[in-house]
Swiss-Prot record:
Extracellular side: 33-993
Species this chain originates from: Mus musculus (Mouse)
Gene giving rise to this polypeptide: Itga3
Glycosylated residues in this chain: 86, 501, 512, 574, 606, 657, 699, 843, 859, 925, 928, 937, 971
Signal peptide residue numbers: 1-32
Protein name in the entry: Integrin alpha-3
PANTHER family: INTEGRIN ALPHA, INTEGRIN ALPHA-3
GO biological process, any: regulation of Wnt signaling pathway
Intracellular or extracellular location(s): Cell membrane; Cell projection, Invadopodium membrane; Cell projection, Filopodium membrane
Intrachain disulfide bonds: 94-103, 140-162, 185-197, 486-491, 497-551, 616-622, 695-704, 848-906, 913-918
Length: 1053
């Protein structure tokens, strides 16, 4: 029975967080991977300026003593013990110590002999290679020079030379490998053959083969040489290609290996030619009988001057048993992309060939010389795949990029970048110029990396152990939570367990390791629904010590008022390995077992879920069926297909019906956290919602909570009222985006776009200050040709129209136009009302000139528009000049004669009209339009002298001219009129002659005398007597009554 859960001592949450922060602050958590940059082995040149580190190699010495050595070439180092030579170059062997200056010079017993050879500046150490564990060492000097015919006619041949030394770096005369001359070039030929071959520019070992590159052979076409030993047999091979041109530099770099283009027992030579056709190439050469290397394939570069092929490396990147090829092009560039240097990765096609195009192209930053060095460094993280190092020595102080591989080949992104400037080494520059790996020098089962430079420094980077975390279990109990069963101290219990092993598989690696972990409840939701009992928050920080501790258990509590009970609560865990690393560089070979790193290929997090108990079927999964219908309504709550908008439009309604009913495709179960989201335009402002409190507005977003849950077969109708506040002339429609959402399962909820088309109705008004004017005609007839001024035409008229603004500026969308149906002439073609000028007043004044030259067509001189005074012999026949002008005035002529009047309009056919248009300005102010005209006096005298009054009518219309179909305006029309009266001429009485007066008086007196005489004759002047008067009175007094006519008639019968 296994051990039970182990509980850690309780500690306050703040203390645990403080500890985590303290560990992180005091130590450095490895952000890269497992090449250590704090515990370094650094070696410096004995003689500065010697290019110590130009070439490097890791070597394991097993003869005479057991030790690992760092080999460094210094091709510009000073000569030793030779009076004829200043510089020869050297190779140094450096032990793994904390000292920088304890390297020893390798003994190469080559003495100067100017008559036979020159070793001055021969660049000894340009190439350094180790044969591997218990193997030999190869050292080359590619500028070693042979002297022919010394004296005045001496000739020199820079053929180069390589030296092989034993495992202890000493010369063993009994070893054929070391005593063989290794001079593959014939110094008796000139540069067109092998007289300038520069053997040793590159070279290396296999178990039974030593190989060299000679890029100067054959006029610098170059060549590659290989010496193979099998038992007691020795075979020499060289490439005799058909290339005739020079300057290819074949052999600039060389690698030899098996399982490249042939099975494991056949060798393939891979050699670079960085100047092939100016773009570089890599030759793959097959070993043939007779000592020839036969060309099998050529991989060509893609950019002129990139130096493709100047560095190559072989490694089985995908573990398919075949070696893959990496080729450097350090001077590759892409100006726009800021790229400088490239590495081409060619994946082996199971021994058949390599593809012509790279499977992967890695780039470095501009001017970095990325790819000038490439090395297969072994499996530094022990994940089962080979890793690669690429140098970029001119990026800052130099960088080394570490790439891991997988079953798919090399990974595109580097797993670690070592920065030269961050190593803290004074004087270090061009870090990464040379590389050597594939050897575990501190014997921790992880291969290490030696990095050289041109600044007289070499640096050993050792690999730290990699830890695999096992059994990263995180279990929550119960998995289905019933809130009713929670207590005050526990609701959910979480158990986490860890174990580890070393990636290299060392069973004895049992270091005490403490993981720092973080648990977070409901990480993707705020506010969280669970909290840890110990930290009183949704986050808990803790530590886990291994291998002693196996598991820990933590209690969680449920928050109050949890709404979301549909989605599970995710409890996430992540962990790290905080280590206390030194802040400063520590030199020496200190063990790195105490500083492991976590395997970055593993996920450093885990999670588990806690579900709420729900009534959503046996699978505890709610399958809802929310459906929605929506429509716009008018203010009268009638369906609205288009909005006829005007400034009087205040409200707009949106009706939404939401249902959750079962269907044949969906179960229609409860919809948890059902929500309706509306995205409305800025022209609509939320006013009210029915039912109230359902929706909340946030700028242009409206959120409506439908229910939690919105139950099966539930229906809801929303009536949302908007205030229409921002509709402009540019508004064509009002789009509203409606989106239903729920935390239940429903994958067919798509947004619905509801669009209401808008017709904008402008509101403007047209008014006339005086609809009915009065004027007159009279006088004499004047011909049109005789008229010079407007006063010659007749009496003046003045109409003043007023237009109120439309509110929104029309700008380029349209124009308001005032049109006049103007009574221009009578039916016989004579002038009627002669327009003299039209003026528009709004933020200034300007004339209106309708088309057709209809305003003042005779170009008469205009005068003061005031009323023309009457002549002394004329007066207006108006009885009540202060009376109401809107009713027909009563004139003197009408009072006396009441003669008839006539009406002239275009509608009754008695007048002819023309159409005058005046575009009005786009302004927010009131616009006034003044129309001035003259009554054509001659026409009225000639044709209407028999009428006491003539009335002339016209019409004015305000309308909108636009090409936008959604903008309209109701035409505004008003009438205008003028009453034109004829004038009364009063003639004064003439003087009468005196004699006529006297005759008339005399005749009157004679007539009066005759009348008096006649009356006298008739007794008119006689007086009655007194008695007769009295009798008459008495008789009259006695009379009672006179009989009627009827009585008289009856009395006669």
């Amino acid at each position: 029975m296994g051990p039970g859960p182990c509980r850690v001592p309780r500690a306050p949450g703040w203390l645990l967080r403080a500890l985590a922060l303290m560990v992180a602050a005091c130590g450095r958590v490895a952000f890269a991977f497992n090449l250590d940059t704090r515990f370094l082995v650094v070696k410096e040149a004995v003689n500065p300026g010697s290019l110590f580190g130009y070439s490097v190699a890791l070597h394991r010495q097993t003869e005479r003593q057991q030790r690992y050595l760092l080999l460094a070439g210094a091709p510009r180092d000073l000569a030793v013990g030779d009076d004829y030579t200043n510089r020869t170059g050297a190779v140094y062997l450096c032990p793994l110590t904390a000292h920088k200056d304890d390297c020893e010079r390798m003994d190469i017993s080559e003495k100067s002999d100017p008559d036979h050879h020159i070793i001055e500046d021969m660049w000894l150490g340009v190439t350094v290679a180790s044969q591997g564990p218990a193997g030999r060492v190869l050292v080359c000097a590619h500028r070693y020079t042979k002297v022919l015919w010394s004296g005045l006619e001496d000739q020199r041949r820079m053929v180069g030379k390589c030296y092989v030394r034993g495992n202890d770096l000493q010369l063993d005369p009994g070893d054929d490998w070391q005593t063989y001359h290794n001079e593959m070039c014939n110094s008796n030929t000139d540069y067109l053959q092998t007289g300038m071959c520069q053997l040793g520019t590159s070279g290396g070992f296999t178990q039974n083969t030593v190989y060299f590159g000679a890029p100067g052979a054959y006029n610098w076409k170059g060549n590659s040489y290989m010496i193979q030993r099998k038992d007691w047999d020795l075979s020499e091979y060289s490439y005799r290609g058909s290339e005739e041109q020079g300057n290819l530099y074949i052999g600039y770099t060389v690698q030899v290996g098996n399982a490249i283009l042939h099975p494991t027992d056949i060798i393939t030579v891979v050699t670079g030619a960085p100047r092939h056709q100016h773009m570089g190439a890599v030759f793959l050469l097959k070993q043939e009988s007779g000592g020839d290397l036969q060309r099998k394939q050529v991989l060509k570069g893609t950019q002129v001057g990139a130096y493709f092929g100047s560095a190559i490396a072989l490694a089985d990147l995908n573990n398919d048993g075949w070696q893959d090829l990496l080729v450097g092009a350090p001077y590759y560039f892409e100006r726009k992309e800021e790229v400088g240097g490239a590495v081409y990765v060619f994946m082996n096609q199971a021994g058949a060939s390599f593809p012509d195009q790279p499977s992967l192209l890695l780039h470095g930053p501009s001017r970095s010389a990325f790819g000038i060095s490439i090395a297969s460094i072994g499996d530094i993280n022990q994940d089962g795949f080979q890793d690669i190092a690429v140098g970029a020595p001119f990026e800052g102080l130099g960088k080394v990029y570490i790439y891991h591989s997988s079953s798919g080949g090399l990974l595109r992104q580097p797993q670690q970048i070592i920065h030269g400037e961050k190593l803290g080494l004074p004087g270090l520059a061009t870090f990464g110029y040379s590389l050597s790996g594939k050897m575990d020098v501190d014997e921790n089962l992880y291969p290490d990396l030696l990095v050289g430079s041109l600044s007289d420094h070499i640096v050993l980077l050792r690999a730290r152990p990699v830890i695999n975390i096992l059994h990263r279990t995180l279990v929550a109990r119960p998995a289905v939570l019933d809130p009713a069963l929670c207590t005050a101290t526990s609701c959910v219990q979480v158990e986490l367990c860890f174990a580890y092993n070393q990636s290299a598989g060392n069973p004895n690696y049992r270091r005490n390791i403490t993981l720092a972990y973080t648990l977070e409840a409901d990480r993707d939701r705020r506010p969280p629904r669970l909290r840890f009992a110990r930290s009183q928050s949704s986050v808990f920080h803790g530590f886990f010590s291994m291998p002693e501790t196996h598991c820990q258990t933590l209690e969680l509590l449920l928050m109050d008022n949890v709404r979301d009970k549909l989605r599970p609560i995710v409890i996430a865990m992540n962990y790290s390995l905080p280590l206390r690393m030194p802040d400063r560089l520590k030199l020496g070979l200190r063990s790195l077992d105490a500083y492991p790193v976590l395997n970055q290929a593993q996920a450093m997090e885990n999670h588990t879920e806690v579900h709420f108990q729900k009534e959503c079927g046996p699978d505890n999964k709610c399958d809802s069926n929310l459906q929605m219908r929506a429509a716009f309504l008018s203010e009268q709550l009638q369906p609205l297909s288009r909005l006829q908008y005007s400034r009087d439009t205040k409200k707009l309604f949106l009706s939404i019906n939401v249902t959750n009913s079962p269907s044949s495709q969906r179960a229609g179960e409860d919809a948890h956290e059902a929500l309706l989201t509306l995205e409305v335009p800025s022209a609509l402002l939320l006013s009210s919602v029915r039912p109230s409190g359902t929706c909340q507005a946030n700028n242009e977003t409206i959120l409506c909570e439908l229910g939690n849950p919105f139950k099966r077969n539930q229906r809801m109708e929303l009536l949302i009222a908007f205030e229409v506040i921002g509709v402009t002339l540019h508004t064509r429609d009002l789009p509203v985006l409606l989106q239903l959402s729920t935390s239940s399962h429903q994958d067919n909820l798509q947004p619905v776009l509801l669009t209401l088309q808008v017709d904008y109705t402008l509101q403007a008004s047209l008014s006339l200050m005086n609809h009915r004017l009065q004027s007159f005609f009279g006088g004499t007839v004047m011909g049109e040709a005789a008229m010079k001024t407007a006063e010659d035409v007749g009496s003046p008229l003045k109409y003043e129209f007023q237009v109120s603004p439309v509110g929104d500026g029309l700008a380029a969308l349209g124009t308001l136009v005032l049109g006049l149906e103007w009574p221009y002439e009578v039916t016989n073609g004579k002038w009627l009302l002669y327009p003299t000028e039209i003026t528009i007043h709004s933020n200034g004044s300007w004339p209106c000139q309708p088309s057709g030259n209809l305003v003042n067509p005779l170009n008469l001189t205009l005068s003061d528009p005031g009323v023309t005074p009457l002549s002394p012999q004329r007066r207006r026949r108006q009885l009540d000049p202060g009376g109401d002008q809107s009713s027909p005035p009563v004139t003197l002529a009408a009072a006396k004669k009441a003669k008839s009047e006539t009406v002239l309009t275009c509608s009754n056919g008695r007048a002819r009209c023309v159409w005058l248009e005046c575009p009005l300005p786009d302004t927010s102010n009131i616009t006034n339009v003044t129309v001035k005209a003259r009554v054509w006096n001659s026409t009225f005298i000639e044709d209407y002298k028999d009428f006491d009054r003539v009335r002339v009518d016209g019409w004015a219309t305000l309308f909108l001219r636009t090409s936008i179909p959604t903008i309209n305006m109701e035409n505004k029309t008003t009438w205008f009129s003028v009453d034109i009266d004829s004038e009364l001429v009063e003639e004064l009485p003439a003087e009468i002659e005196l004699w006529l007066v006297l005759v008339a008086v005399g005749a009157g007196l004679l007539l009066l005398g005759l009348i008096i005489l006649l009356l006298w004759k008739c007794g008119f002047f006689k007086r009655a007597r007194t008695r007769a008067l009295y009798e008459a009175k008495r008789q009259k007094a006695e009379m009672k009554s006179q009989p009627s006519e009827t009585e008289r008639l009856t009395d006669d019968y």
